[in-house]
Amino acid sequence: TCVTTTWMRFCEKLLEVTGDPKWADQIERTFYNAYLGALKADGSEFEAYTPLTGNRWHGMNHCFMHTDCCTANGPRGFLCFLREFFRKKGDSATFNFYASALVDGFDMYSLYPRTDWARIVSHTAGPLKLRLRIPAWSAKTVVKLNGKELGYVRPGSYFTIAHDWKLGDIVEVKFDMPVVAHTFGHNVAFTRGPVLLARDSRFKDGDLTEPFRRGIKDGQTMPTFAAVRTPSDDFWMAFSATLPIGSHHENPEGANPSTVFFCDYASAGNAWHRNNYYRTWFPNEWGPTE
């Protein structure tokens, strides 16, 4: 967690110096995965290490004080995220992140990144340039002002709305947020927007180490993923997916795809006990010719 918060603050400084939204993308991805994944649900402590596969567990105690550096440094990540959430300078205002919030001149309503939209309501009057960070992963973002769709929205940029604002003007942002596969070596992982997805032993849906069959490509969208109701309050997001899992091709039953469940990485393993196992990278089937 100490490294996570330091990385977030480093990206914050780079964002302020360069104005490049890719650093806001990095803060966002870190915040919703490694950072929130390290935080215990009751807010009492931050985990020292957040592995991509394994368990969540307590950090070491320093100097017999029943706390550690990660729990001490952890709150700085919230300060970084909130400090860069909304910025106003001169004749422009910038939204770097999306969540329900009340800021100077605007209200935002959103369950992002659980949902793929944000709604911004104006409480200001007069000319102002409103800048919206468009994440690099959102290939086809739609922005509307008072119901009218605006021009081309380029991924990985700031979209500027130069407007003479009136009380009650509404901006709607719709992100392109499919589940995407990422391959590395003979392994595959899945993301949805800025969020890494994981399988969790609490779903009780089979062997988490079972390999995926060949054929999944890097950057491939995965249309069989669907958002479902979370099984308990321990999960923030949940998805079902019908996927080619298992290597028993010669068996007609084994050749069928399997339906399994995923959650967001921050929720994975958050029971904080040894029996709660999760996994984000999955083995991909391969042979001696590869």
Give each language-model segment a name.
Residues 12-16, 118-122, 160-161:
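Short, well-ordered beta-strand elements within core beta-sheets of diverse protein domains
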Residues 138-163, 181-185:
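Solvent-exposed beta-strand/loop surfaces of large extracellular or lumenal domains
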Residues 24-33, 38-123, 154, 174-290:
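C-terminal beta-rich recognition modules with glycine/proline-rich loops and embedded aromatic residues
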Residues 165-167:
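Surface-exposed, short loops/turns at beta-strand junctions within beta-sandwich domains
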Residues 126-135:
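Surface-exposed beta-strand/loop patches in extracellular or lumenal glycoproteins
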Residues 1-15, 71-81:
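Well-ordered alpha-helical segments within folded domains of soluble proteins
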